[in-house]
Structure formats: C-alpha cells, structure tokens
C-alpha cells in the first residue's frame, strides 16, 4: 500500500517540529514533505525580505502540491504557515498554535492583520492543535469552533529522557535549556545566582543553547563575578541534552510568555526540580511548592530566595520530582500521544476521501 503523504509547512530545524514530523513517520507511517521560508527573521532588512517571500509563498506551495499530491497539509503557527495551509486548497488541513497566543508581540502594528489571517486559518482548518490547555483561552476568545480543537501535547521520549538522575546532592546544580533570547530573561537568572554567590552558597549553572543575547550574558556573568560557575555550552545536539539534565537537580525557566514547554516536560522526566516563571503556560503544569516553584516575572531576588528554599528542602524536592515523573508518564508520553495524533490524521484523510 502506498504511504500517505503529508506536506509540513514550518521551520524544520526547530526541535518541536522535528518531534512532530518524526512522530508521524514512526506512529502513522506517513511520508513527510516540507516547505519553509528561507529568509531569517532577524533584523529589519531580513524581515522586509521575508514579507516579500511570504507574498510569493502561495504559488510555490501550489507548485509543490501539484507535483507531490499530498493527502494532507499541516502547519505550525496560525498567523503565518497556518494561513498558507488554509489557502492551499488541500483537505484536510491541521494547524498548530505555537504559543499562548500567536498574536505576538501584543502591541505590534500588524496585529489587526494577524487577527484576520488567524481567523481565516481557524475557519478553514479541519483540526487545530492546542499543545496544552493555556492555548485554548485565546482560541475561545477568537470564537473558534472548539470541536475542531485537539488539546494534547506531542509528548517527549521517556526512554531517552530517563529518570536516572545523578546530580551532585551537595550543591545546587542548575540548568537552563531555553534559547538565549530577551523574552527568556537569562539576565534575571544570572542576577539571582549572583545573590547566592554573595551568600557563599555553592552552585554550578549550566546554560544551554544559542541566541542573540549570548555575548551580553557572558559579559553579565563576568560583571557579577560568577563566570567561573556558569557554563555556556552553546547549541548542542538534542541527543546530548538528557545526560546534562540528569546531571542537574534544578531546572530554571523565566520566560515572560509561554505556550507549552517541551523543555519543562524534559526536566520533569529527568527528575530535575522545576523553578519557573509564574505565568499561565507554566501554571498549567506547576503548583507552587507542590511540584515546583512559581516566580513572579523579572523578580531575581525572589528567584534567589526560592532557589535557596528548594535546595534546603531536600525531602520536598524528592517528593516533587517523583510526582512529576509519574505525571509525564501518564500525560506526556510521546509514543502514546503521537499515536493518537497520527490516528486522527488518518481518520481525517479517510473522511476527506469519502466526501
């Protein structure tokens, strides 16, 4: 039997896109073809160039469809690739909202246009992915037909992200795995560890990833006199991540906005105790001082206090990480969740062919 073919519209280098595509191949036996914008989104010149590229994207996608004849189109982001998927003419279409809302930044002058584009994508799609409950709030506000919405995270590979944690119990071994971008507030994290350093509390802080803030953050670490205790790894292969998480006892993430964080799930799976910003995307999974800690946005002093509290309360941390592992096994297992998603796609294709 010929494999069914899916056209994926989105940035194929992103970890969650790779998870999505690989899961469909593994659990749905789909063949995946891809298309994405080639121009970078950094810098004003590139953004203007990217807008022109987006304007011609429809014709390029139509040509791919004529040649490859996909059975279905899927796309990330309801305000860009999701809109192109809705315009493609292929049925069925599944789109995924990537954040708490894709209408971001919230004060952007292009917001009215983005709303129009998003509403069109929502109406024309056959399935809308909400990778977590927090995403449904903006969908309800946009009057989306919630019968089309599947609330389910893609999940993580629980074999790869095992719970055999071997962090040094004698000191804070903290890890940050978010991109080095302003919205992730790595500077707040560094300032909190400077307070710990001033108090004579031993720690090792590992900051994974790359991004526009790297040189600024390295300079800040020097300015705070903690550069010898902070390890900036740069970008690493995803295969190296589980081991680094397993060598850490505390996971920190301080974003100002969040949809559903696979990074948080990875930390929960590997018995890293999560300390995260107190925002809706994190409140869906973390209860303060129950299975982690929630910190007000940009409050580095509070973060320092809670880091000390969590490290001193060893029994609490042990109970929390055990609870978190059970939670991800029940709710965020990639092999279970991606099978559900792949089966749903087959059903949609069957229904479309029957019409």
Q: Positions of the model-derived regions?
A:
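A conserved nucleotide-sugar
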Residues: 183-186, 190-232, 239
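Short alpha-helical donor nucleotide-sugar binding micro-motif in glycosyltransferases
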Residues: 65, 235-236, 243-248
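Short hydrophobic beta-strand element within catalytic cores of glycosyltransferases
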Residues: 273-276
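Aromatic "clamp/platform" in nucleotide-sugar-dependent glycosyltransferases that forms part
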Residues: 256
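Conserved donor-binding/catalytic core segment of Leloir-type glycosyltransferases
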Residues: 7, 129, 167-193, 206
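Carbohydrate-associated surface elements
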Residues: 134, 155
């Amino acid at each position: 039997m010929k494999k069914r073919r899916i056209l994926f519209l989105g940035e194929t280098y992103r970890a969650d896109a790779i998870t999505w595509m690989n899961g469909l191949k593994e659990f749905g036996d789909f063949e995946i073809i891809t298309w994405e914008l080639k121009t970078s989104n950094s810098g004003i010149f590139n953004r203007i160039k990217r807008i022109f590229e987006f304007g011609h994207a429809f014709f390029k996608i139509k040509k791919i469809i004529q040649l490859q004849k996909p059975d279905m189109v899927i796309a990330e982001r309801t305000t860009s690739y999701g809109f192109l998927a809705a315009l493609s003419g292929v049925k069925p279409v599944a789109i995924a909202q990537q954040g708490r809302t894709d209408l971001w930044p919230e004060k952007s002058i292009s917001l009215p246009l983005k709303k129009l584009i998003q509403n069109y994508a929502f109406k024309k799609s056959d399935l809308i992915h909400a990778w977590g409950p927090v995403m449904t709030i903006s969908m309800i506000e946009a009057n989306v037909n919630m019968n089309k919405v599947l609330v389910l995270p893609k999940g993580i590979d629980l074999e790869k992200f095992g719970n055999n944690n071997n962090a040094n119990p004698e000191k804070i071994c903290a890890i940050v795995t978010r991109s080095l971008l302003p919205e992730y507030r790595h500077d707040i994290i560094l300032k909190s560890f400077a307070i710990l350093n001033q108090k004579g509390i031993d720690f090792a802080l590992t900051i994974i990833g790359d991004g526009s803030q790297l040189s600024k953050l390295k300079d800040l670490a020097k300015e705070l006199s903690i550069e010898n205790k902070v390890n900036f790894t740069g970008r690493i292969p995803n295969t190296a991540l589980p081991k680094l998480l397993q060598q850490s006892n505390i996971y920190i993430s301080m974003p100002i906005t969040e949809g559903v964080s696979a990074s948080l799930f990875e930390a929960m799976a590997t018995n890293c105790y999560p300390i995260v910003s107190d925002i809706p995307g994190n409140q869906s999974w973390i209860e303060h001082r129950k299975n982690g800690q929630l910190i007000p946005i940009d409050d580095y002093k509070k973060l320092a206090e809670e880091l000390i509290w969590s490290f001193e309360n060893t029994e609490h941390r042990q109970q929390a990480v055990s609870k978190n592992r059970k939670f991800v096994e029940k709710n965020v297992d990639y092999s279970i969740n991606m099978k559900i998603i792949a089966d749903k796609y087959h059903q949609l294709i069957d229904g479309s062919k029957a019409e």
